[in-house]
Amino acid sequence: MEEKVETPANGNKDRFFTPPLIIIYVTVFIDLIGFGMVIPILPFYAESLNASPFQIGVLFAVYSLMQFLFAPLLGKLSDQYGRRPILFISILGSAVGYFVIGFANTLFLVFLGRIIGGITGANISTAQAYIADVTTRENRARGMGLFGAMFGLGFIMGPAIAGILSKYGVHVPFYCAAVLSLANAIALYFVLPESLKPENRRARKDGSNRIQQFVGALKERQFGTINLVYFLLITAFSIMTYAFVLFTAYRYGLSAEQNGYLFAFVGVISVIGQGLLFGFFVRRLGEPVLVCIGCFLMSASLFAIPFVGPLTGGLAALLVCCTVLSLGNAMASPALTSLGSKITAEHEQGSRLGIMQSGASLARAAGPMIGGVLLNNQFNSIDDATVNRTFFTASAIMAAALLVSLFAVRVVRNVQEIS
């Protein structure tokens, strides 16, 4: 793959919306459309292959487990060889994973596709490192906030498209996601410039292995505290993401198409929160305060979800809970990512953000596994009792994240003094 290192990617950092930054946002957006198409459809697809709620949880978990194992590696490779080739290969691999799932006629092949997609989809830290390369420390929080908004946009378009396509068969959204990823990889190859100059790349061998780097980074007081809160947040949110489709199908009787539209609504709220409100509030309150506010909103909304239903507030009550939950996540998640980036040296952005996203991937693996155990009853189905304990557990985890945030507020405030 021919390397294209363009000095404007590093030279125009005083101007926020540079061409490389716009291109990486478009690339991430297209990548996340494909990802967003999978979430509301996968539970119904797995159920068509006679999967139990627990097995569906494992399907969600195995994807993130692969990301946990491979995110630091891809981040480190991007520090050595540049961001562009890693992004290209990983997005191309995502297309392969989607094709495998689309052609699957057994649960084993669905698992295989999820494993392939998880390995090659561990590129979030590389994209974040690209953003760190082309932004200044002063506007990095804004850059990460807009990166989070790309997630929201992906969760608007992806689930909505999946909902429409699911009417033609549960396989169709996966074929569409595969074609979209393939087109994205081709476009990236021709238009995305490299952001990391050769002189800023790390040597291949640095005298320590990945596990030592991982443990060493987490032992640091500031970085470790940020990662603990981030891990708890992602765990709770992943329990909800896994359980939500099964919950709405059970409590409201929503179909795959209707769940796609509901996830699209959540995406709209996420875009508003991360794309508009986050930048406004972070300038006035700072990242540490937004982390605390976000954790509180998420805990409260997760606690309230089991109490809503057709006879208790109807769909409107559920939408209110989803709105509060999404806004809470829109405040806390990019604030934590921004803090993690600010305390990291420039030449370690890829590997450190890879470590942070690796922990998040472990949380995304743990969340569905926990949810799968809690939501599954003795008859391999769900009921009111399993719904209650699943969402109450997620709420308790966010309450713990809030307590850690409040206790460690001095630690994370020190980041602002350092930066």
For each predicted feature, which ranges?
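Juxtamembrane intracellular "pre-TM" segments in multi-pass secondary transporters
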Residues: 6-18, 193-229, 251
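Short amphipathic helix-loop junctions that connect adjacent transmembrane helices
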Residues: 40-54, 242-259
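Helix-breaking motifs and short loop linkers at transmembrane-helix boundaries and internal kinks
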Residues: 50, 82, 103-108, 253, ...
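C-terminal transmembrane helical hairpin of 12-TM major facilitator-type secondary transporters
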Residues: 288-336
